[in-house]
């Protein structure tokens, strides 16, 4: 077991500071001299791009970023007076009439930039640091423009908790201006018949089941929906409750259910009456859902102002939305379902069961031939699944669409018969039919079609690498707000989203004291694949560093790994050598993970092990002492895959040789690290430190605002001693 007071762990003198902050490529004396020269010149250089600045220039003309004082790098561990909590405005702000608070530093700049861009019909892409109040400034700037131009604001969020924050800010705005807002969620989150059930049903399948039940209610047939019947009766009550209380999504759902009404149906009917509608990404990313969503908002004649929260997630979300797979479980259960049906003809003399079995045989054959020892994927040539069907049953390629339509119709009839019996079960035949149709019409230029192998067996994968539909939609908008705390490089986001050339890009730093956060990295370990293979001791050295850091920082600590696999492999050593309360993010077990997280947050010196890019790293706030220390293991470059290779090649062709890897691997990895570091500081008084255990961080020290440390344990002890001496 690692001893709690490791030799050298309490070194807090001159050598420790020199090691941490004096190794940026120059001897320490030279570094001080350079800083002194700059300081005496009035700090006339941009800290980001090194461009010369004019006197009193607030924004760098070269890179567009707000200029900050370089300051004294040795003062970063010192505690200074913190920014006071944001105050409610006493009188209306004439320059920002929808801003309910006394503005913090930079907030008026952001609001003015948003309004100016929107008034000019332009998109604005913003990276805004923690504490700038992304939600309130985007609403304040967006609402002023929307009200003047008769637009409805659609605020897109990745999580329900983010939509709840929008409602909280709208409630504050309502105290100074008449405003209304409502949160919309998907059927699977709001439908009383399916809410809380552990089902993985595609939205289009759930929509069909819902429409069928509503149709039965309207016809007075059995198998209808009692919640739908009640909704219109109490709709005025729901509207009044929403406009008076600005409820969260959960609060509104409970209110509707208390009246015996369907929350989903009520929101759908009411949203056209509200100024602001918050919704998950899928309401815009899915073409089918978007069409219905816009119709419910008032139709094409209702102009929209889109505000995208956590915009760095939108591109991946768009790809995931358009991607799909066909698993052996889907195929096997569809075959079983066919055996219960007396009539299953999908063509002249052709049964659905025979078609599906042929597809299963094709998948098995390709897997046997192409996926050997150590391989888990094989990129399929064009028509690899379709050709055996054509050969077997003797029809033309154009007939395949009729075959899949017939399978879908069989599934619909199957669900009708189940509903007659009061059974909510999904037809596997219908679900498979939809997936097969999508497979056969998906463009090979936009999708990577592959056969893959997992622990559960073989499956067909259609991974979207070019979500052109959302790009087309974004370009059709006359202005939108794209915001995130980790969106750089902004020009890359601009290109991938296909935004107009006149799009405005802005970066705003956090107003919180820089001294409250420290980021350091080490240069003697790495999780780079070839180096870990070449040096068998690398894993052990990383494990020991994690253990020593956890031992010597008597604070709540989050350890972020680049993958679940690495976390699993290191777990036995860490459980043996860290004598503290330990908690783990469990892949595929969300409830278990959340219970562990609740216990971790209640303590003061526990260690929670997680994965970068997961829900803990991006979706959870840890105010105060809930989190003080982050250990980041490695650089989370995505693992090699057919999709990564295809996307990289696509971006190389579009934007220039070498940019493909940067866009698909480097930027997402750095963004994940920045998101993980961002968990540390969530308000003015938070203090936190992050240690990156990977020498490759030296390449990204400017983006990560990190300094090299020769003794991270000593530097962590020194940083947290400032807290104990307060």
List the model feature ranges, each with a label:
Residues 120-140:
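Walker A/P-loop
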Residues 562-586:
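Conserved helicase motor "Helicase C" RecA-like lobe of SF1/SF2 P-loop NTPases
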Residues 523-537, 587-696:
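Conserved RecA-like P-loop NTPase helicase motor core
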Residues 138, 161-164, 168, 257-402, ...:
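Signature of the SF2 helicase/ATPase Hel1-core->accessory helical subdomain module
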Residues 81-98, 102-105, 147-277, 285, ...:
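A substrate-engagement module of RecA-like helicase motors
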Residues 115-116, 135-149, 168-172:
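Walker A/P-loop NTP-binding motif
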Residues 527-562:
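Conserved interdomain hinge at the start of the Helicase C-terminal
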Residues 252-275, 285-296, 403-526, 534, ...:
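A contiguous, basic/glycine-rich beta-loop/short-helix subdomain that forms a polymer-engagement track
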């Amino acid at each position: 077991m690692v001893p709690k007071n490791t030799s050298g762990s309490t070194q807090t003198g001159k050598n420790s500071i020199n090691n941490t902050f004096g190794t940026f490529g120059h001897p320490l004396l030279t570094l001080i001299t350079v800083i002194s020269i700059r300081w005496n010149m009035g700090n006339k250089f941009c800290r980001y791009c090194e461009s010369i600045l004019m006197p009193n220039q607030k924004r760098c003309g070269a890179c567009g970023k707000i200029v900050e004082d370089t300051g004294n790098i040795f003062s970063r561990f010192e505690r200074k007076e913190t920014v006071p909590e944001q105050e409610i405005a006493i009188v209306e702000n004439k320059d920002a009439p929808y801003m309910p608070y006394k503005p913090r530093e930079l907030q008026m700049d952001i609001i003015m930039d948003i309004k100016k861009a929107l008034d000019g019909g332009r998109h604005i892409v913003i990276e805004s640091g923690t504490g700038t109040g992304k939600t309130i400034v985007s609403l304040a700037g967006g609402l002023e423009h929307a009200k003047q131009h008769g637009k409805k604001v659609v605020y897109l969020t990745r999580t329900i908790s983010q939509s709840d924050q929008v409602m909280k800010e709208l409630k504050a705005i309502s105290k100074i201006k008449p405003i209304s807002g409502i949160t919309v969620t998907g059927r699977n989150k709001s439908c009383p018949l399916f809410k809380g059930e552990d089902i993985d049903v595609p939205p289009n399948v759930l929509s069909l089941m819902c429409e069928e039940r509503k149709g039965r209610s309207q016809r007075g047939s059995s198998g209808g929906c009692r919640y739908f019947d009640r909704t219109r009766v109490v709709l005025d009550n729901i509207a009044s409750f929403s406009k008076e209380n600005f409820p969260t999504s959960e609060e509104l759902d409970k209110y509707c259910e208390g009246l015996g009404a369907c929350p989903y149906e009520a929101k759908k009917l009411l949203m056209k009456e509200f100024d602001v509608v918050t919704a998950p990404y899928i309401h815009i990313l899915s073409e089918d859902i978007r069409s219905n969503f816009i119709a419910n908002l008032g139709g094409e004649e209702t102009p929209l102002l889109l505000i995208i929260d956590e915009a760095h997630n939108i591109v991946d979300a768009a790809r995931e939305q358009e991607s799909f797979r066909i698993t052996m479980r889907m195929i096997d259960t569809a075959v079983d379902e066919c055996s219960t049906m007396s009539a299953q003809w999908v063509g002249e003399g052709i049964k659905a069961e025979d078609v599906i079995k042929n597809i299963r045989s094709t998948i098995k054959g390709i897997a046997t031939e192409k996926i050997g020892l150590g391989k888990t994927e094989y990129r399929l040539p064009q028509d690899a699944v379709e050709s055996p069907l054509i050969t077997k049953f003797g029809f033309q390629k154009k007939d395949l669409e009729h075959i899949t339509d017939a399978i879908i119709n069989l599934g619909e009839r199957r669900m009708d018969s189940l509903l007659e019996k009061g059974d909510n079960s999904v037809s596997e035949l219908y679900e498979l039919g939809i997936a097969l149709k999508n497979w056969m019409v998906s463009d090979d230029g936009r999708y990577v079609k592959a056969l893959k192998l997992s622990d559960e067996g073989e499956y067909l994968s259609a991974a979207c690498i070019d979500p052109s539909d959302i790009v087309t939609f974004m370009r059709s908008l006359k202005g939108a707000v794209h915001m995130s705390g980790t969106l750089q490089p902004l020009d890359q986001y601009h290109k991938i989203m296909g935004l107009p050339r006149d799009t405005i890009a802005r970066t705003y730093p956090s107003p919180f004291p820089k001294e409250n956060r420290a980021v350091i990295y080490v240069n003697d370990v790495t999780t780079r694949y070839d180096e870990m293979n070449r040096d068998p001791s690398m894993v052990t050295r990383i494990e020991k560093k994690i253990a020593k850091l956890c031992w010597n920082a008597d604070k709540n600590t989050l350890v972020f790994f680049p993958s679940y696999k690495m976390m699993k492999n290191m777990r036995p050593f860490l459980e043996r050598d860290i004598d503290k309360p330990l908690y783990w993010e469990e892949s595929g077990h969300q409830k278990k993970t959340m219970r562990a997280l609740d216990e971790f947050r209640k303590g003061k010196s526990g260690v929670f092990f997680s994965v970068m890019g997961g829900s803990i790293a991006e979706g959870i706030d840890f105010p105060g002492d809930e989190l003080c220390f982050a250990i980041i293991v490695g650089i989370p470059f995505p693992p090699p895959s057919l999709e990564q290779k295809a996307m990289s090649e696509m971006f190389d062709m579009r934007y220039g040789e070498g940019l493909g890897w940067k866009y698909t691997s480097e930027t997402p990895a750095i963004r994940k690290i920045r998101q993980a570091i961002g968990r540390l500081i969530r308000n003015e008084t938070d203090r936190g430190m992050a240690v990156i255990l990977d020498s490759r961080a030296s390449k990204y020290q400017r983006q990560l605002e990190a300094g090299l440390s020769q003794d991270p344990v000593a530097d962590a002890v020194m940083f947290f001693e400032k807290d104990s001496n307060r």
